[in-house]
Amino acid sequence: MKEIFYDWGGANVWLFHAINNIRFEWLDNVMLFGTYLGGHTFFPFYLVILTLIALFAVNRPAQDFSSYETRVKRWMAVIAVFSFAYWLDGILLGTLKPLLDFPRPPLALPLETVNIIGATELHHSLPSGHSSFAMMVVASLWPVLTRWLRVAGVCFVLWVGLSRISLGAHFPADVLAGFILSLAVVLLVYVAIQQLMQLMRKEHAT
């Protein structure tokens, strides 16, 4: 199973080297910054910024009260999804990483074949926490993003994911697993919150 879903018949390692071997000093700095922005420690900062944007957005003039109410509920749902998805994603990552304990590239491959930029990490490769967090941020905000902001969001997610490979911290399969895990978490939390809001509306109506 591992050979199919993780090794990809050798493509996982091949793709890692194809990305990790692209070396320019300016590119290293770009990738380091991408990893920096994709760190879970940025959650409080992103939450504050999101809350300020939500306050600004809901206080814009509305055509009628119904439009205003819809806008408020949409932003409340986004903030709730963002917060609960972060919490659930953290629990899953904290469980899966040590449980699976996949080796990172510097441990799984001959060390001289891996370009490492930044700290050397050896264990808990699957899934990528940075990639998961980046996907969680963008997927949570997706309902309130404009078309161009969605494009920017996708670019951000790919940037963070590629940075983990470029810096020698993860294999492509780790990054993809992080994306899938976080997207599934956001969708699950979104559906749960929508169901809860519908239930609250029904109770309020009665």
Identify the residue ranges that each predicted region occupies:
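N-terminal transmembrane-helix/juxtamembrane module of multi-pass inner/ER membrane proteins
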Residues: 1-46, 93-121
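Membrane-interface loops
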Residues: 65-143, 200
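Membrane-embedded catalytic cores of phosphoryl/pyrophosphoryl-handling enzymes
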Residues: 114-206
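Hydrophobic, aromatic-rich transmembrane alpha-helices
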Residues: 44-60, 134-142
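Alpha-helical transmembrane segments of integral membrane proteins
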Residues: 33, 41-45, 77, 147-155, ...
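Membrane-interface elements of multi-pass transporters and channels
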Residues: 22, 26, 56-59, 98-103, ...
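Membrane-helix interface segments
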Residues: 26-27, 71-75, 145-152
